[in-house]
């Protein structure tokens, strides 16, 4: 369900985008000036012509091809046709060409005139825009029988008479199409050139059409320009191929104007689209005329011109609702062709076109919905403490006091009591092993301490370094007498140097660390009486007898923290010498085993003493005077 809800706003945006193009297209801002639709019609027309055959229905097939460009301009059209004897039986093809061309000009503002020439000129149809009279003129034209010479100048004289008679007051452009099928004689050609020039002075545009045995140079000289010349090489049957091109050039009309409305008081340009703009002779002779009424007429020069359009600056509009029509002149105002389009002034501003507001009105609820969804997500995700900074700007006068420090964490619970050790660890604090003398033989052994402490410990050998006083040894007689009935895990203190010897009952790994000498104590693996040798120098070798040792540890004494490995036993006492941080591991003969060796911790750390629970059961330490050891 969540995925469908998230796609909803995007689907609405897509629908709104589909609604945006119609106002833009109505405004004309996205107009596409591509190929005219007439091109496709001409293609269809050509295909129909390819299947045309003379017969009972040949006229019907001919007229079916009259669906080309329909000129809607306002001008006068003159046909000057050659009916000399050289035309002979081809007159019917010439007539059909005229009939189809006339059908392309359907505007009621177009007047037509049919003139024939041979030895003399003849006006078959005087200039008129009446459809019935034009139809009657075509019927008369069909009945003509060609004969005589080719004197084209006679036909131009008849056309000039019509121009002077019907176009004296109204400045309407005149289009003359002069057709010939042969070459003109010299004097006829010269006379024709003079008559054609007279017609141009009256504002006429001259086109020439040559068929069969024409002279291209002659018809080009008679026409206004090479672009006004049409030549047919394949005889009269091919005249129909010139209809589309001739109609588009001869026709003078305005098809559309952009824009259709303009803002009041703002400068703008008018783009005029139409046909026949290629008939201009000079660019500076083109005039765009804007007619508001009979008394208000504004002429402007175009800024750009091509064959189908021109761009002219539009007149200033002073009030809304004004309307004007457009006329175009290609011969410096001699004649103008009118258009059926007009431009209306409107009030400019944001409310110019209400269609633009339809998408905006639809977007407003969508935007509100999106904002509400975003705000809702933010309020859900934001934790309550985030709102504190919002209250800070309100308290501007007094600075807020710093928050109180957090309460200290609760004390950690005391560690669980250590397990009860069944065998003690002896910590002997001597005066230190430093000195030149090294260690000497110690009288007695530590069996006494094991016997005093607990009955389960038997014959535990003990060791101690020599005191700072050379040749002095500790005596265990007093300790043996006073600690005959002591429980296990006692603490024994020697007041000479305040060192203590503790015997915890736990299986441990014996470790020994001695400094300031490089003596090693080798313990051979034997069932009893191993020798412990401490090498202090090359001249002295002291040995310490160890009874009933089931294992063979090694003891190394060096100037830096030394380590030695010894068998791990359940009864693993440890001797620590406080002044020099030396430790001597002791083994219990009855419970010794052989685990892997370990290294002693740094010399600055002491072995742990008895646990707090066992300290209550331990007897107070026994003080031994320093002067009682035996020598």
UniProtKB/Swiss-Prot annotation:
Signal sequence residues: 1-27
Sequence segments annotated as region (Disordered): 382-413
UniProt cross-references to Pfam families, sorted A to Z: Anth_Ig (PF05587), VWA (PF00092)
Keyword Metal-binding among record annotations: yes
List of residues binding a divalent metal cation: 84, 86, 150
Name of the gene: ANTXRL
Protein's UniProt name: Anthrax toxin receptor-like
UniProt GO MF annotations: metal ion binding; transmembrane signaling receptor activity
Biased composition (Pro residues): 398-413
Stretches assigned to the Extracellular side: 28-353
Keyword presence, Transmembrane: yes
SUPFAM superfamilies: vWA-like (SSF53300)
Superkingdom in the source lineage: Eukaryota
Compartments in which it is found: Membrane
Classification via PANTHER family: ANTHRAX TOXIN RECEPTOR, ANTHRAX TOXIN RECEPTOR-LIKE
UniProt family annotation: Belongs to the ATR family.
Composition-biased stretches (Basic and acidic residues): 388-397
UniProt domain VWFA: residue ranges: 76-246
UniProt topological domain (Cytoplasmic) ranges: 375-631
Segments crossing the lipid bilayer: 354-374
GO cellular component assignments: cell surface; plasma membrane
Keyword set, alphabetical order: Membrane, Metal-binding, Signal, Transmembrane, Transmembrane helix
Gene3D superfamilies in the record: von Willebrand factor, type A domain (3.40.50.410)
Record membrane topology: Single-pass type I membrane protein
């Amino acid at each position: 369900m969540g995925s469908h809800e998230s796609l909803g706003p995007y689907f609405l945006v897509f629908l709104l985008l589909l609604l945006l193009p119609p106002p833009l297209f109505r405004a004309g801002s996205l107009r596409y000036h591509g190929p005219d639709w007439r091109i496709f019609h001409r293609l269809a027309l050509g295909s129909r012509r390819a299947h045309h055959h003379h017969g009972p229905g040949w006229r019907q097939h001919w007229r079916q091809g009259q669906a080309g460009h329909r000129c809607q301009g306002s001008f006068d059209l003159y046909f000057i046709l050659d009916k000399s004897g050289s035309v002979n039986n081809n007159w019917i093809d010439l007539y059909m060409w005229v009939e189809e061309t006339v059908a392309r000009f359907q505007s009621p503002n177009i007047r037509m005139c049919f003139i024939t020439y041979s030895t003399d000129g003849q006006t078959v149809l005087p200039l008129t825009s009446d459809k019935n009279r034009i139809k009657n003129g075509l019927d008369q034209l069909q009945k003509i029988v060609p004969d005589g010479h080719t004197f084209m100048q006679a036909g131009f004289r008849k056309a000039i008479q019509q121009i002077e008679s019907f176009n004296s007051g109204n400045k309407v452009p005149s289009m003359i199409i002069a057709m010939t099928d042969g070459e003109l004689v010299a004097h006829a050609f010269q006379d024709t050139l003079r008559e054609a020039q007279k017609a141009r002075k009256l504002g006429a545009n001259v086109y020439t059409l040559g068929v069969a045995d024409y002279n291209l140079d002659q018809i080009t000289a008679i026409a206004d320009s090479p672009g006004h010349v049409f030549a047919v090489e394949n005889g009269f049957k091919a005249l129909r191929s010139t209809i589309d091109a001739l109609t588009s050039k001869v026709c003078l009309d305005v098809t559309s104007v952009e824009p259709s409305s303009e803002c009041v008081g703002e400068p703008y340009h008018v783009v005029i689209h139409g046909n026949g703009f290629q008939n201009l002779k000079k660019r500076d002779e083109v005039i765009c005329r804007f007619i508001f009424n009979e008394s208000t007429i504004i002429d402007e020069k175009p800024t750009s011109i091509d064959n189908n359009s021109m761009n002219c600056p539009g007149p200033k509009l002073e009030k809304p609702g004004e309307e004007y029509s457009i006329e175009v002149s290609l011969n410096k105002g001699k004649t103008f062709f009118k258009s059926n389009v007009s431009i209306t002034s409107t009030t400019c501003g944001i409310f110019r076109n209400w269609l633009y507001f339809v998408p905006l009105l639809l977007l407003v609820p969508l935007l509100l919905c999106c904002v509400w969804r975003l705000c809702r997500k933010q309020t859900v995700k934001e934790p309550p403490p985030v709102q504190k900074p919002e209250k800070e700007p309100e308290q501007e006068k007094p600075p807020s006091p710093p928050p109180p420090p957090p309460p200290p964490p609760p004390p950690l619970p005391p560690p669980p009591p250590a397990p009860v050790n069944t065998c003690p660890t002896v910590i002997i604090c001597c005066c230190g092993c430093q000195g030149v003398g090294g260690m000497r033989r110690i009288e007695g052994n530590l069996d006494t301490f094991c016997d005093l402490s607990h009955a389960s410990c038997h014959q535990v050998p003990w060791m101690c370094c020599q005191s700072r006083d050379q040749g002095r040894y500790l005596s265990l007689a007093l300790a043996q007498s006073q600690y005959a009935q002591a429980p296990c895990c006692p603490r024994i203190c020697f007041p000479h140097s305040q060192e203590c010897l503790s015997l915890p009952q736990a299986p441990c790994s014996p470790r020994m660390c001695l400094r300031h000498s490089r003596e090693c104590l080798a313990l051979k693996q034997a069932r009893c009486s191993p020798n412990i040798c401490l090498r202090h120098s090359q001249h002295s070798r002291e040995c310490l007898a160890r009874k009933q040792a089931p294992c063979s540890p090694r003891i190394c004494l060096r100037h830096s923290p030394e380590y030695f490995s010894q068998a791990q036993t359940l009864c693993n006492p440890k001797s620590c010498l406080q002044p020099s941080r030396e430790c001597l591991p002791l083994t219990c003969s009855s419970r010794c085993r052989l685990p892997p060796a370990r290294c002693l911790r740094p010399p600055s750390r002491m072995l742990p003493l008895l646990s707090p629970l066992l300290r209550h059961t331990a007897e107070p330490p026994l003080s031994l005077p320093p002067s009682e050891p035996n020598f």
